[in-house]
Amino acid sequence: MLFISSNTNVIEKGPKLGKRAQALLKKQEDTSFSKEPISSEDYLELGSADEESGDRWLGSDLSKSLRFYQKAYTNYLHSIQLDKVNLDSYYNSSRLLFQVYSQYFKTDGVNVYDLVNVNDVLTNDESSVFQDLTAILHAHEDALEVARKLNVPIPLDLIFNSGIVLTEVLEVEQDNVNSNFNRLLEITHTAQEMFKKLLDLQVNEFQKFLGELEAIPEGKLDVNQPNQDISLSAKQEEYTSEEVVQPTDILETVLASYKVAQAILENITDYSTQIQPVLDLINPFLSICDEISRDLIENFSETSPHDMVSNISLEQIGELKIIKTNILGLLMNDLNQLFDLWSSDNIPKSAERFMLAADNIQSLLDRNDYTLSSINATPTDHKDLYWKALTEMNNALKQAQNILHQSYLEKKKTPSGKDIGLGSLIAQISEVMIARADVDLQRCQVVGYEPSEKNKQVLLQNSKTLLKNAMTLANTPGGLRERVAEKLQREKKKVDAVLRMCVLEGKSTIDELDTILGRNKWINELPTLKRLAYFEQFGINNIEVPPF
């Protein structure tokens, strides 16, 4: 069971745009090509202009946006052909590949094969901007190698993006039953080394900056002296600009580093043999991250602010606490200990906290093969624990839903002309309700267990009610400025809920499903639902996809 982040942006975490790329995009705002590009730099700048056009269309027309991204990628490749060591072109092309992957592959509900007039993109060769993770990783490795050949400092954003891609590889491997765990450990090591290098560079650069601050004569920054306010404000703006590494930048890298540990821990399928190699690998690096984050919070946060830097917010501190708690939970293999961990009052009561708690419980259930089928063949004490786990998950998801719903009510008050991510929030609440429906569906099928059998009909009705509510909410528009990807997210959740309801109510003939959902929609979602054993009792395996 997976949940989208409590961040309501269409993408949770994409690649960073480097300063050189930003400068090129800014340049294109003032100039345009009046002649055919000739040099490597010409193609680089033209690619940057096309990429900016793709960004502008992303909210309203995914097909048009993708076509611009393809043009940009083609121009970056031309630039590389003309100059085999043009680092900016290598960086931009690798970053764009991951951006397109994030927007068009990872975003729930978006299917690139449903888009129109994108045949030039879907060529299944190296010229396409739509690539798999292996190709994206190789592109980042090529960019890093060019920087080494040039013997120039590797751009910090390139290092960060490379680490993020490696983490994504680990996360995707969770669904691969044939994954090689030793290979996953190697990827983890590479990702950790990437982020360790980045942290070293960022911390050193920030310490150098602090040294420069301390070298400024005290009177120069005395806001009590006449006419000093304006100069101090200008100096502070300069120091907190993106040209200088800030505490918030370092914390972002720390959070990304923790997510590497989280990703490898979620890949553990045999706790007894795999946990120790993972601990040996991640513990030294986690200690470094812990030390850095403690120093940042103690000296450069809203709890103890520094006047001349971008201080870490309380929200960011909360995010740090939540991900560290999740890592602690994934290190455990005892459900009762896990329940106690997430019950702590020291963890921020955010939607993300409660969704991760539910996910954490599900991870341990999966790791130990605690499924409805296996539990129904076990003694009562195992059923007690399984029931408690499902109940804890339901309680956590209910709290997440309440928090998200309150955020939804607040955002609805915002003037309709603003882009506030309301559509993504609607999709997220719908997903949480669907997850709760799945939990109740499992709770009503624990055979030979009194609480389940006694409340069977109530729990089944709860599941149906949650699905109906999810359908209704997912059908609610996200405002005038809703992005097209948000609409697709909502539509995906609506289909998820409707197909489940059809199965539970026995409306599962081909004609019924075609009429209610449309064939393309239900046949796309059916394989996912068939993997959930708790729908077997309702005849889901009797539904066959008709031949085309």
Tell what function each PLM region has.
Residues 6-70:
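N-terminal alpha-helical scaffolding segments that mark the starts
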Residues 4-16, 23-26, 69-154:
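Long amphipathic alpha-helical scaffold regions
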Residues 37-57, 83-121, 152-175, 210-214, ...:
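Amphipathic alpha-helical repeat scaffolds of TPR domains
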Residues 37-41, 62, 130-133, 155-156, ...:
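Amphipathic, non-membrane alpha-helical segments in soluble helical-bundle scaffolds
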Residues 186-189, 262-340:
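Non-catalytic interaction/regulatory modules that flank or connect domains
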Residues 31-37, 77-90, 139-157, 198-216, ...:
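Flexible helix-coil transition and linker loops at the boundaries of alpha-helical arrays
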Residues 53-71, 99-142, 168-197, 201, ...:
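Short coil/linker segments at helix-helix boundaries
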Residues 1-15, 309-312, 316-548:
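Long C-terminal extensions of eukaryotic subunits of large macromolecular complexes
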